[in-house]
Regions:
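Short, ordered loop/turn segments at secondary-structure junctions
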Residues: 47, 106, 130-133, 156-157, ...
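C-terminal catalytic/substrate-binding lobe primarily of soluble NAD(P)-dependent oxidoreductases
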Residues: 1-7, 203-448
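N-terminal glycine-/serine-/threonine-rich beta1-alpha1-beta2 phosphate-ribose binding loop
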Residues: 1-117
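Rossmann-like NAD(P)H-binding beta-loop-alpha module
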Residues: 144, 148, 152-230
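Short gly/pro/ser/thr-enriched loop/turn and capping motifs at secondary-structure boundaries
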Residues: 50-51, 132-137, 158-162, 183-187, ...
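Short catalytic-loop micro-motif centered on adjacent basic/acidic residues
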Residues: 43, 102-103, 125-128, 151-154
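Rossmann-fold NAD(P)-binding glycine/threonine-rich loop
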Residues: 109-121, 129-157, 162, 167-168
Length: 448
């Protein structure tokens, strides 16, 4: 794909985008946009307005060129006067002449409301907030399509990157037996000390004998990763964001997880084709075409998967794949499968291509056929008494006492499990025992 001809400044006008959320993702998008001739970001909405001002300054735009506005009228005037506008309510900038909303707030209800309003005002939506996309992405996509607009995930985050890699493989006629991403966590093994460090969890643990599990050898792959897991039980092997992102991928591609909490093996990059294939061929999956994640197992001197994405494909043309294997592509021990992967995700640094594709080509880089196939639900991990408030917080937007699980999507009803991010800040109206999925009937919900 030659991007410079697709997005040629000599034949296209600049795209004007607004941004909601100025955290790590939003700030990186804002910075990178300054180097893109076809992209301008003259408005940012965030709950903490100083964060947006700081993001503009970090991107090379002085505070003197930024106006914090407290009403729609103030925002319109500041915009007309050539200032970059910062607000704490999306309604204040919804009527500005903008082409695209990049939604990266991570706040599910506010995010959904902003996206819906943007669509009503004629903007395309690049949805970065997976918390929102996993719950109402298909609804927002339909609303956008009805108005001739684009709703899409954004390149730079794993869902869009994996959706793109899957679609690339399908266009080329590859039989994809597995797909997924590396988790939030690297497990870094130091063979000299027999220690495993997980920087993401700020833990280092002794693992005597791990050296014997460094390679599969002639042993079954499932046996080896099972022994690794047993040595690393004090570390978390999956997170709610991992599950949420794969729900988004499932709804865009039709591929489903093999089990509600994934297999999530601790695995080296070159082990992917032995693991993410059917059990009949020595892998983990009950059936082909499944989604999963893995925790990248590596030495300190080896490169990380960096939260990247992968597909595992069938090696139908044995002769060609022997050539490719010799060039270094990871293949399974039985030579039936190969892993193709993209070891990076660059946050907002690469989201600009999704913005330009939506505005200039009406193309959704994250796929145009979103369906409610998979729900991220919440399950109590301990007894939760009536009156418990399901507060959501932290970097990973977790709920204390509740874990995420992936289930086939179901209509919302009194006894149906609710999507995880609809539980946020709700109060239990009855006791919920450990192991139970939390349903609508368990919550004290407002009548509206």
């Amino acid at each position: 794909m030659f991007y410079e001809s697709l997005f040629n400044p000599s034949i296209h006008r600049p795209v004007k985008a607004c941004l909601t959320g100025a955290g790590e993702f939003g700030a990186s998008f804002l910075f990178q946009a300054q180097g893109m001739p076809l992209l301008e970001v003259p408005a940012v909405c965030t709950r903490t307005v100083q964060r947006a001002v700081d993001a503009y300054e970090n991107a090379g735009i002085p505070a003197s060129k930024v106006r914090v506005c407290e009403s729609a009228e103030d925002a319109k005037k500041a915009y007309a006067d050539g200032f970059n506008v910062v607000v704490d309510s999306f309604e204040y900038i919804a009527d500005l002449p903008l082409d695209v909303l990049v939604e990266s707030s991570g706040a599910p209800e506010a995010s959904a409301a902003a996206a819906e309003l943007a669509i009503e005002r004629g903007m395309h939506v690049v949805m970065v907030s997976k918390e929102t996309d996993s719950v109402v992405g298909s609804i927002l996509a339909r609303k956008a399509a009805e108005r001739g607009l684009v709703y899409t995930t954004g390149d730079g985050d794993q869902p869009s990157l994996l959706i793109g890699l899957i679609s690339w493989g399908r266009v080329l006629g590859m039989n994809i037996v597995g797909a997924g991403k590396s988790s939030e966590y690297d497990f870094i093994y130091d063979p000299a000390r027999d220690m495993v460090l997980c920087p993401g969890q700020k833990q280092e643990i002794a693992t005597p004998g791990m050296g014997s599990l460094w390679q599969f050898g002639n042993r079954p792959a499932e046996e080896v990763v099972g022994k690794r897991r047993a040595m690393l039980t004090s570390l978390s092997h999956r997170s709610v964001p991992d599950l949420c992102e794969m729900a988004v991928v499932a709804n865009a591609t039709g591929m489903m997880p093999d089990r509600p909490l994934f297999h999530a093996p601790v695995a080296r990059i070159d082990e992917m084709p032995d693991l993410f294939c059917p059990k009949a061929d020595g892998g983990l999956f009950d059936a082909p075409g499944r989604l999963d994640i893995f925790n990248c197992f590596r030495r300190p001197d080896e490169a990380s998967m960096a939260g990247g994405v992968f597909i595992v494909v069938e090696c139908k043309d044995k002769k060609s794949w022997q050539v490719l294997k010799a060039k270094g592509h990871p293949c399974s021990r039985n030579d039936r499968y190969a892993a193709l992967y993209h070891p990076a995700h660059l946050l907002g640094v690469e989201t600009g291509t999704s913005v330009l594709a939506a505005a200039l080509m009406k193309h959704a880089t994250g796929g145009g056929n979103l369906r409610p196939l998979c729900d991220l639900c919440g399950r109590a991990v301990r007894d939760l008494p009536k009156g418990t408030v399901l507060d959501m917080g932290g970097h990973h937007h977790t709920i204390d006492g509740v874990e995420g699980v992936l289930n086939p999507a179901a209509a919302i009803g009194p006894d149906a499990a609710l999507p995880f991010y609809l539980l946020s800040h709700r109060t239990l109206c009855r006791d919920v025992p450990a192991g139970k999925l939390i349903t609508l009937g368990d919550l004290d919900m407002p009548e509206e």
